[in-house]
Regions:
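Alpha-helical metal-binding/catalytic segments enriched in His/Glu/Asp
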Residues: 49
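Extended beta-strand/beta-hairpin segments
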Residues: 1-44, 52-145
Length: 145
Protein backbone atom coordinates (compact mmCIF):
# COMPACT_ATOMS: atom_id res chain seq x y z
CA UNK A 1 0.00 0.00 0.00
CA UNK A 2 1.23 3.50 -0.80
CA UNK A 3 0.15 6.23 1.62
CA UNK A 4 0.07 9.90 0.62
CA UNK A 5 0.57 12.87 2.96
CA UNK A 6 0.67 16.63 2.50
CA UNK A 7 3.68 18.40 4.07
CA UNK A 8 2.62 21.88 2.92
CA UNK A 9 2.16 24.01 -0.17
CA UNK A 10 1.59 21.82 -3.22
CA UNK A 11 4.08 19.20 -2.04
CA UNK A 12 2.84 15.64 -1.76
CA UNK A 13 4.76 12.83 -0.09
CA UNK A 14 4.19 9.16 -0.78
CA UNK A 15 5.32 6.47 1.67
CA UNK A 16 6.14 3.06 0.20
CA UNK A 17 8.10 0.14 1.66
CA UNK A 18 9.65 2.29 4.38
CA UNK A 19 10.71 5.06 1.98
CA UNK A 20 9.21 8.52 1.64
CA UNK A 21 9.13 9.87 -1.90
CA UNK A 22 8.82 13.66 -1.96
CA UNK A 23 7.11 15.47 -4.81
CA UNK A 24 6.27 19.09 -5.50
CA UNK A 25 4.97 21.10 -8.39
CA UNK A 26 7.27 23.44 -10.32
CA UNK A 27 7.25 27.09 -9.29
CA UNK A 28 5.61 27.96 -12.63
CA UNK A 29 2.65 25.77 -11.59
CA UNK A 30 2.37 27.36 -8.14
CA UNK A 31 4.53 24.85 -6.28
CA UNK A 32 7.79 25.34 -4.49
CA UNK A 33 9.92 23.40 -6.96
CA UNK A 34 11.52 21.59 -4.02
CA UNK A 35 11.25 18.08 -5.48
CA UNK A 36 10.41 16.38 -8.77
CA UNK A 37 6.78 16.50 -9.84
CA UNK A 38 4.76 13.28 -9.80
CA UNK A 39 4.91 13.26 -13.61
CA UNK A 40 8.71 13.59 -13.50
CA UNK A 41 8.77 10.52 -11.25
CA UNK A 42 6.52 8.68 -13.70
CA UNK A 43 9.11 9.23 -16.43
CA UNK A 44 11.95 8.46 -14.01
CA UNK A 45 10.33 5.12 -13.20
CA UNK A 46 10.44 4.16 -16.88
CA UNK A 47 14.08 5.24 -17.27
CA UNK A 48 15.19 3.54 -14.05
CA UNK A 49 13.39 0.34 -15.04
CA UNK A 50 15.05 0.35 -18.46
CA UNK A 51 18.38 1.04 -16.76
CA UNK A 52 17.90 -1.92 -14.44
CA UNK A 53 17.20 -4.24 -17.37
CA UNK A 54 20.31 -2.98 -19.20
CA UNK A 55 22.46 -3.45 -16.10
CA UNK A 56 21.08 -6.92 -15.47
CA UNK A 57 21.68 -7.89 -19.12
CA UNK A 58 25.37 -7.00 -18.83
CA UNK A 59 25.89 -8.58 -15.42
CA UNK A 60 24.22 -11.87 -16.41
CA UNK A 61 26.70 -12.16 -19.30
CA UNK A 62 29.76 -10.97 -17.39
CA UNK A 63 30.00 -7.86 -19.58
CA UNK A 64 31.52 -4.59 -18.45
CA UNK A 65 29.12 -1.82 -17.46
CA UNK A 66 31.78 0.88 -17.85
CA UNK A 67 30.13 3.61 -19.91
CA UNK A 68 26.67 2.01 -19.81
CA UNK A 69 24.05 4.75 -19.78
CA UNK A 70 20.33 4.91 -20.38
CA UNK A 71 18.57 8.15 -21.21
CA UNK A 72 14.91 8.91 -21.77
CA UNK A 73 13.42 11.70 -23.83
CA UNK A 74 9.73 12.54 -24.02
CA UNK A 75 8.05 14.14 -27.03
CA UNK A 76 5.03 16.16 -26.01
CA UNK A 77 1.68 16.43 -27.78
CA UNK A 78 0.66 19.93 -26.74
CA UNK A 79 -2.75 19.68 -28.42
CA UNK A 80 -3.72 16.79 -26.15
CA UNK A 81 -1.54 17.86 -23.19
CA UNK A 82 0.23 14.52 -22.91
CA UNK A 83 3.34 12.66 -24.02
CA UNK A 84 3.16 11.40 -27.60
CA UNK A 85 6.40 9.40 -27.72
CA UNK A 86 9.01 8.19 -25.29
CA UNK A 87 12.49 7.50 -26.62
CA UNK A 88 14.93 5.39 -24.63
CA UNK A 89 18.56 5.46 -25.75
CA UNK A 90 21.20 3.07 -24.48
CA UNK A 91 24.88 4.00 -24.57
CA UNK A 92 26.50 0.59 -24.70
CA UNK A 93 29.47 -0.07 -22.43
CA UNK A 94 33.05 -0.19 -23.62
CA UNK A 95 33.80 -3.36 -25.56
CA UNK A 96 30.14 -4.37 -25.81
CA UNK A 97 29.88 -7.26 -28.31
CA UNK A 98 27.91 -6.31 -31.42
CA UNK A 99 26.23 -9.73 -31.39
CA UNK A 100 24.38 -8.70 -28.19
CA UNK A 101 23.02 -5.35 -29.44
CA UNK A 102 19.59 -6.63 -30.56
CA UNK A 103 19.29 -8.82 -27.46
CA UNK A 104 20.04 -5.81 -25.23
CA UNK A 105 17.28 -3.82 -26.93
CA UNK A 106 14.83 -6.71 -26.50
CA UNK A 107 15.79 -7.03 -22.85
CA UNK A 108 15.34 -3.34 -22.10
CA UNK A 109 12.00 -3.33 -23.95
CA UNK A 110 10.75 -5.89 -21.40
CA UNK A 111 10.81 -3.28 -18.63
CA UNK A 112 7.79 -4.00 -16.44
CA UNK A 113 6.87 -0.31 -16.11
CA UNK A 114 6.72 0.04 -19.91
CA UNK A 115 4.71 -3.17 -20.21
CA UNK A 116 2.13 -1.76 -17.80
CA UNK A 117 1.72 1.25 -20.08
CA UNK A 118 1.23 -0.98 -23.10
CA UNK A 119 -1.44 -3.03 -21.31
CA UNK A 120 -2.68 -0.72 -18.56
CA UNK A 121 -4.43 -2.01 -15.46
CA UNK A 122 -7.99 -1.02 -14.64
CA UNK A 123 -8.27 1.90 -12.22
CA UNK A 124 -10.82 1.99 -9.41
CA UNK A 125 -11.45 5.04 -7.26
CA UNK A 126 -13.31 5.22 -3.96
CA UNK A 127 -13.91 7.85 -1.29
CA UNK A 128 -14.50 7.29 2.40
CA UNK A 129 -15.03 9.47 5.45
CA UNK A 130 -11.77 10.90 6.76
CA UNK A 131 -10.22 9.64 9.95
CA UNK A 132 -9.92 12.08 12.82
CA UNK A 133 -7.04 14.45 12.04
CA UNK A 134 -4.34 15.17 14.58
CA UNK A 135 -3.92 18.75 15.77
CA UNK A 136 -0.67 19.02 13.77
CA UNK A 137 -2.47 17.88 10.60
CA UNK A 138 -5.26 20.42 11.21
CA UNK A 139 -2.73 23.20 11.71
CA UNK A 140 -0.86 22.27 8.54
CA UNK A 141 -4.07 22.06 6.50
CA UNK A 142 -5.25 25.46 7.74
CA UNK A 143 -1.88 27.11 7.06
CA UNK A 144 -1.97 25.91 3.44
CA UNK A 145 -5.26 27.70 2.69
Amino acid sequence: MIEVSYPGGLAVNAAVNGFTIRTDQPEAAGGGGTAPSPFDLFLVSIAACAGYYALRFCRERGLSTLGLRVSLGAERDDAHKKIARIRIAIDLPEGFPERYRAAMLRSVSQCSVKRHLEEPPAFEFSARAAAVATSAERELALSAV
